Amino acid sequence: MDKYRLTPHKITICVLVEYYLNGTIKYHQKQSLSHLLIRHIKENNYQDTVKEVSLYDFIEKELKYVLPIQFINNEFLRMIQFDSVDDIYQFMSSLKELFNGSNDHESINSKQMQLLDSKSILGIFIKKVILNFNQILFDGLIKLYDQLDQYLNDFYNEINKIQQQQQQQQQKEHCENDNSIDMSMDQEQQQQQQEDYNEISNYENKIKFLSPLDEERFIYEETIRINSLIGIETPLEIENQVNRLKASLPNVKRVHLISLLFNIGYQDYDQSLEDLHRYFDYVNGQMTSSQWSSSASSFLFTPNDNYQSGNSNSSNYYYNNYNFIGGSGDTTNLMLPYAVLNLVRLHYHFGHYEESYLALREAIRIAQERADHSCLALADHWLARLLKKSVYNSMESSNLLQYLLASHSDSEILKKSIERSRDLEMPDLLALNHTAFSKYKLENGEFSTNINSNNYNSNNNNNNNNSNTNNNTNNNNNTNNANNNNNNNNNNTNNTNNNNNNNNNNNNNNNNNNNNNNSSNSNNNGGVNMFGKSFHLWNDIFQPIEISRLLDKSSSTAMIAHHLYSSSWELLGNNDLAQFFTELAMKSYHSNDLSLQHDPLRAVSSQNTIIYNIGTNNNNNNNNNNNQIKQQQQQNQQPPDLLSFCKLALLYSKKSKYNEAIQILIKCFSIYKTQHLCGNLLTFTVLSILFDHLMINIDNNNNNNNNNNNNNNNNNNNNNNDNELLISIVIESLINITNRFQSEDSVDGSGWSQIVICYQKIIKYYCNVRGMYEKSMNLIVKGIQISRDFGLDSQITHFYSLLSKIYEKSSPYRFSGLSDTLSALSLSNSYHLANSIADSNIALIKIHLSTDRLDKAITLIKETLPMVLSDKLLNSQLYLLWAKSLISTSTKQSIDYLNRSEQLFLQLFSNQSNNNNNNNNNNNNNNELLKEIYYLKSIIYNDLGDIENRNLYAKKFKSILVPSSSIQQQQQQQQQQQQQQQQQQQQQQQSNQSPVINSVQPTPKICLVPPILMKIR
């Protein structure tokens, strides 16, 4: 290698020199990197004939032992990848700034760049490289660019070659295993026992040679690994692994934490409590103050909370690096308040809320005595949880919290916790509080702008076109700069999520240009921004989620945010966006996210061979290599969390895509084989989907009864009886598995929400199938009371809507549902739910038409149509109602609206028929809708004197009212009766020999006018 010639390896050394000076690098890594750079520079200067080192050998043999693999994957390979010749020129220009610095003094002060000494070894090398580069002509630049490209291509090809070799080796191992299947069971058991014994002995021998620090790191990684197996492996197998670690490393304190998480995961309260006490007995008082400051770890575990239905893994915890604030240097009982806080969390998880509150009071008392503000901030968070309606109303002795509820609320305590965690610079807790605040707004529907002005933007008001804030305040100010109130002509675009699902959360003054990207595939399901107060509500919901993601960029926080977005869009009625964010949550889940070794660069073999995740390339060969690498990584990926699986299955069921839902459930059962021992989430999901499927079958059988003969009708009736029996069993099972003491951090989610969902399913079954209106009303009243008492105000809208439909179906009490319709409408307006508002408005429009208030009906129709532009069924119903209101005034417009209604309905029906999974939830209602359309058209054309169209739509109406099969049966019966009469008459003629005049029986007439529509005619 010529020392006077620029090579790709020299360019790589220059990249590392620049990173050595100004990169984020630890001291010991910086020292090792300097030795590596100096050695390679000397080799380039004194060994001209040595062949240049390849990139793969350089990384595999030297660089990966100096710098972390994560840096090599995410930054280093991008640094040495140049997309054009201009990129090489810009890089060389940046090398000159290493000696003199940049002209921008502000950037120098902010970044604190370190200059390179021109007389040092590194400085002399960089100067030679710059000198050689300045002497290169344009043809030489092209050649250097091609060499760099080939330099990277060789690296990719080497990775691909190693992958193929490993795959071949794995295939050979599989073949050898297949050949040894003939071994007897006794020999296999003996061999397995011997292997287990050898593994344990080797395991213990290897662990004995670990240093204390390595032991802690090893147990930390084992904690994460074993915790990710809960619900997947059998409890006995996990327990054996935990016992093996205890026997090997009995003095390592975190071993007992593994046992604690294991017992929490499998819902063993007594053993969890014992392990918690044992864990803190080992931890307490065994570390000096210097050890605490050096380790920077409190060993405190708090729930990685999921605010929709609980976390996918009930014992998924993260460790926070909090600085302990104490008045004295005494380390005795240093961990006592945190031990009590963990006791609070343990009682809360198992639904023992009284014990949890008493333990929280003790933790607050100890923290106040020691002036431990970090512990008090955590206590505020847990106090806000205990003050929730769903918690304190579940207590058997709720008088414990009466004095607190008289002066405080959960939202006030939560705001206080947000302020305290911001002041103490606790970003993890601050992110957790923001997501809790977002969930509170989502459930209760309350909003105010004070939280934005007092908490979010207290330090972020930029005037006179200033876009930068001071970096010397705290971590939260750094992250909240994305939410600044920019004055005096600032252009503010705030993209808060993927795929156009954006919710802008900035309040801009004085001619700001807000680009609000609230569209979602042009399917917004009804103008949420039409309402004046909706901006503040959704600003309070979506803005805290984005702040939490800025504060904590871990995959667990991203998964929580995606589930909250999914719940919000599902509440709005947009199931497509809810499914989209659920799939994002599945992609962002990593059970080993807390691992110190967490990296997409995973070892693919026991020989420490690494697969690198490469960025974009310029060559097709590179793209093929990347695709193969991604496929290998996808095969090695961990399965998504159970919560995302179940939620996606429920969304498919809600859209009547049962085949997809069943496939997801089958995959869940194949992965989470022991999940039934951890909780009831998977069982609840299966029963809910089974209930929906049985309801569809009953509707299909009822519709088929009108199109089949008597034998088929009997079969359908028998099938309905079987389905109704199964539904009753499913309802009993759903009620049995619900538990009001299920905490929101449990794998099953909040218990009261599941109970309310069960009530809604039972009400729909009693009302739509069985016609049991009294039972339905009793359950509705009970469901409304539960929703009010336990903080589920968003569910009250559905109950009032169901109650108004019950009154609508019972004709004597039809106008009694007006108050319930208005209640559902007001609640839907307060929550800005477009579909619920449309349903309530349709019920109110029908009442207006029944009382001849046509002007109010037309006005309400015009207000409702923009809300449901994407829902063809609701659009069809609204146009039908509009046509009814115009029959007496304008027949042409009425026919026009009837044509629109028919066209929308037929489009919806054709889309459903093309889909293999037809949505038949409203088949009976749809038939009634089409029947009314044909009936009204036949009446209007009759009044206009258009006999042809009148007969056409009368036949269509008759075909729906009396199916063709039943008409054919009637005709056959009439023919048989006529033949019998003719035979009888012939017999009489032969006996009496007297003429008899045959009497002609009139055919039965079919009424074309239902009694409901007589008044409109």
UniProtKB/Swiss-Prot annotation:
Pathway(s) it belongs to: Protein modification; protein ubiquitination
Keyword Iron recorded: no
Annotated segments matching region Disordered: 451-527, 617-636
GO cellular component: a single term: anaphase-promoting complex
A Gene Ontology biological process term: protein ubiquitination
Pfam families: ANAPC5
Chief place where the protein resides: nucleus
Superkingdom classification of source: Eukaryota
TPR repeats: 30-63, 182-214, 252-286, 337-370, 508-541, 642-675, 756-790, 838-871, 876-908, 931-964
Quaternary data: The APC/C is composed of at least 13 subunits that stay tightly associated throughout the cell cycle: anapc1, anapc2, anapc3, anapc4, anapc5, anapc6, anapc7, anapc8, anapc10, anapc11, cdc20, cdc26 and cdh1.
Protein name: Anaphase-promoting complex subunit 5
Organism from which the protein derives: Dictyostelium discoideum
Gene that this sequence comes from: anapc5
